[in-house]
Amino acid sequence: MPIQSFNSANDGLESGARSRGHFIANTDVDNEKLWVPYADGVWIQPCCFNVTSVGFSVLLKGLPGAQLGVHYHVGTVRGYTIQGHWRYLEHDWVAKPGTFIYEPAGEAHTLVVTDDSPEPALIMFMVEGGLIYLDNPVDGEFAAYEDGFSALELCRSHYRDAGLDVKLLDALIR
């Protein structure tokens, strides 16, 4: 779940320990331990944490009917649908396997996996900058904030609780 108060953001690595080179991240959609709980019926699997832009890249898995709270992005977002059906309540389109989306910053929307999705949705999201969650879609006030640092901490906490090696996440920090 996103943070609701701020403190000094730090990726926890010693100076010089963060790799600057290119890399690959191998995901395993069948390994349930790697899925980090994010919201009711929604999980993420991390691919990259960009501490320069405070962005992050994740696989998002959502069960039919699951939704994320209304939010907007302070940077652009790119997404690619691998399986399942999903949409934003505020739009008429439905994303299906093969759908690519590009979101400019600043539009409030609510991600919903459609009730009639034939399987859980699996979406690759590349998020530049943070997300601002709102308490309601009409004239919403600030409810929570999410970015690469808070996503990293959420993943670290899950890895510790699941008995996974937290250092695996350090390799995803750029």
Residue ranges and their predicted role:
Residues 96, 105-136:
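Ligand-binding loop in jelly-roll beta-barrel domains
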Residues 51, 78, 89-110:
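Short acidic-glycine-tyrosine-enriched beta hairpin
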Residues 46-53, 66, 72-76:
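Active-site region of the double-stranded beta-helix
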Residues 1-54, 139-142, 153-174:
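A short, N-terminal "cap"/entry segment at the start of jelly-roll beta-barrel domains
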Residues 44-46, 57-59, 78, 100-102, ...:
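Conserved hydrophobic/aromatic beta-strand scaffold that supports enzyme active sites
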Residues 63-64, 73-90, 96:
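Glycine- and acidic-residue-biased ligand/ion/polar-headgroup-sensing regions
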Residues 58-60, 68-73, 90-93, 112-115:
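Short histidine-centered beta-strand/loop micro-motifs
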